[in-house]
């Protein structure tokens, strides 16, 4: 949720760190800070600021020089946003500096013990506990000081530590919060996200939980928190720095909405097998015999990924005839769920680092379950923990609000459902039908986006609403849920989603002219049922915007979406509602790429 970036080498470090923080702004934050040193400098120099990275940059003095440093963007969990609570945190003797992502669960107990020993705390944060533990250690090496501190803390962390007496190194560690190393020419980088690294290096090493690393300018080594050396194999990142630029768009959200046709083309590329009307998904590590033995599918995700999973569950039931359902990972991991060896579990996450999803995967693995991962970021924690899976190949998604990753996740589920179906009873004819539908998607997405001006005008009207209702039935219901989430995320307009079949069971009491209803009305076997719901709303003077394949007489306005196969329609029907949310937020002057109180990757509980 926060962002870490660090560097050790020969270059002037402050501009590098500030640039790295700017590339991590999309993760969400409320304050920022930086600390630097060099072999020729006595001690550590630090600057912190509440607000944006530009506020921090304005406070950094011209003579703030160094060749080693760490920096951080903070998203408050312990203590309000302020200069004092911003990271890095420094020891009383100004020798130890720490940046930290995660939550120290036993921070309160440790703080009391340290205060009883005379330690004075300056901030309200849990991170400051780590600083004092490292500073008070009597170990000779910085690595051992950090190891001793980590031995007594409980919780999650991704940390980077500097010490004035060891200014030739940065020590980092990971447990439940991502840490990525970047390997350069006689220089090393560290970050919580590869977005901060790709402008400088494509060679990365991702630390595992329970792993530490020492970074020097011309070398690095990795080891467990117990001190055992580990082998680090660098991987090459395919994403380019240009992928993180806006490319002429006003916001990343707008850019990423318009990248969806190309993104869908990428997730399909090389996977379709026309000869057998199926798809190649070698990364599943699941052969035909094992696929036929699956008796149930359980999909776990959070937020938008959960909604993609809801759509995926319906696709799997329809095409593979396997009972399937989706559940928020944040709920699943806290109940004593029955783990069935004949159930295939699928974890969905854009970042591959979502804490609740990762924790659910780890618990399932502990109980012997087979788990697949559907993620966007190559080499992420879920990708490494899972038995197999699929990359959705959406490319970097910078806006906090997910658009193209959601779409590519739903396409990935369509591919998986087709694959499972063809190992069972799905006919060649139906396999071919779905493949033809998948191939139409990029062109149909482009067609939807060509109606942007029409949707923009509608959004300017809806910006006046205080609340909105979204409805859909069966395939349309997850689309309604995701559209509702998008609107509230970026516009801050209250929105709720209900199955259209549930209108009589409560939501009808809300219907009035001031409450717009957005209805998902696909031209499928439930068309007349959906039209009946529109009749009920209209009879109570409700205003209706329909998203449909043909004009709806009872709706005040209709956004026409091109028709695909029934099973694939949900992939398309949410895209105009992404634009609706975007332009509603724009009309209200919202910070679209960085909505208040939200973060891109939720890596804490």
Describe the role of every protein-language-model region:
Residues 1-246, 250-251, 259, 265-296, ...:
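Conserved short alpha-helical segments that host acidic/polar catalytic motifs at enzyme active sites
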Residues 165-166, 177, 204-248, 252-255, ...:
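A SIS-like phosphosugar-recognition module
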């Amino acid at each position: 949720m926060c962002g870490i970036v660090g560097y050790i080498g020969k270059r002037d470090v402050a501009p590098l760190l500030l640039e790295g923080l700017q590339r991590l702004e999309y993760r969400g934050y409320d304050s920022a800070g930086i600390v630097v040193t060099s072999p020729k400098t006595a001690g550590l120099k630090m600057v912190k600021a509440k607000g944006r990275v530009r506020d921090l940059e304005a406070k950094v003095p011209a003579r703030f020089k160094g060749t080693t440093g760490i920096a951080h963007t903070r998203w408050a969990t312990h203590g309000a946003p302020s200069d004092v609570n911003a990271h890095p945190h420094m020891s009383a003797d100004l020798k130890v500096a720490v940046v930290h992502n995660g939550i120290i669960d036993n921070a309160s107990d440790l703080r009391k013990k340290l205060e009883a020993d005379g330690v004075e705390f300056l901030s309200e944060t849990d991170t400051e506990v780590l600083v004092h533990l490292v500073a008070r250690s009597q170990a000779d090496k910085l690595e051992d000081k950090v190891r001793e501190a980590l031995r007594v803390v409980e919780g999650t962390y991704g940390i980077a530590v500097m010490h004035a007496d060891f200014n030739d190194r940065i020590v980092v560690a990971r447990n439940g919060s991502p840490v990525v190393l970047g390997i350069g020419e006689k220089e090393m980088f560290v970050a919580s996200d590869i977005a901060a690294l790709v402008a400088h290096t494509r060679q990365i090493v991702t630390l595992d939980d329970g792993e530490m690393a020492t970074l020097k300018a011309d070398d690095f080594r990795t080891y467990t928190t117990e001190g055992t050396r580990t082998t680090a194999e660098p991987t090459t990142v395919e994403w380019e720095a240009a992928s993180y630029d806006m490319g002429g768009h006003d916001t990343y959200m707008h850019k990423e909405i318009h990248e969806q046709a190309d993104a869908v083309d990428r997730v399909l590329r090389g996977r379709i097998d026309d000869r057998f009307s199926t798809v190649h998904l070698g990364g599943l590590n699941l052969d035909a015999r094992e696929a036929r033995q699956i008796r149930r599918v359980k999909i776990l995700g959070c937020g938008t990924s959960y909604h993609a999973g809801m759509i995926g569950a319906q696709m799997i039931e329809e095409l593979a005839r396997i009972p399937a359902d989706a559940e928020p990972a944040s709920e699943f991991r806290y109940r004593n769920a029955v783990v069935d060896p004949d159930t295939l579990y699928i974890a969905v996450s854009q970042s591959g680092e979502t804490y609740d999803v990762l924790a659910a995967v780890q618990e399932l693995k502990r109980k012997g379950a087979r788990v697949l991962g559907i993620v966007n970021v190559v080499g992420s924690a879920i990708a490494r923990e899972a038995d197999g899976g699929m990359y959705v190949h959406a490319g970097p998604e910078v806006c906090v609000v997910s658009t193209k990753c959601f779409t590519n996740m739903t396409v990935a589920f369509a591919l998986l459902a087709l694959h499972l179906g063809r190992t069972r009873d799905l006919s060649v004819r139906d396999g071919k039908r779905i493949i033809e539908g998948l191939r139409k998607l990029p062109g149909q997405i482009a067609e939807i986006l060509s109606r942007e001006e029409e949707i923009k005008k509608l959004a300017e009207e809806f910006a006046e609403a205080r609340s909105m209702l979204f409805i859909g039935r069966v395939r349309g219901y997850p689309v309604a849920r995701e559209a509702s989430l998008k609107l509230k995320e970026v516009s801050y307009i209250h929105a709720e989603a209900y199955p259209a079949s549930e209108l009589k069971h409560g939501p009808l009491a809300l219907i009035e002219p001031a409450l717009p209803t957005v209805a998902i009305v696909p031209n499928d076997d439930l068309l007349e049922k959906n039209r009946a719901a529109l009749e009920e709303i209209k009879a109570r003077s409700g205003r209706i915007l329909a998203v449909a394949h043909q004009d709806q007489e009872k709706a005040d306005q209709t956004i026409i979406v091109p028709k695909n196969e029934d099973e694939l329609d949900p992939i398309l029907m949410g895209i105009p509602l992404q634009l609706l949310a975007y332009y509603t937020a724009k009309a209200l002057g919202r910070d679209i790429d960085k909505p208040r109180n939200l973060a891109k990757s939720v890596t804490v509980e």
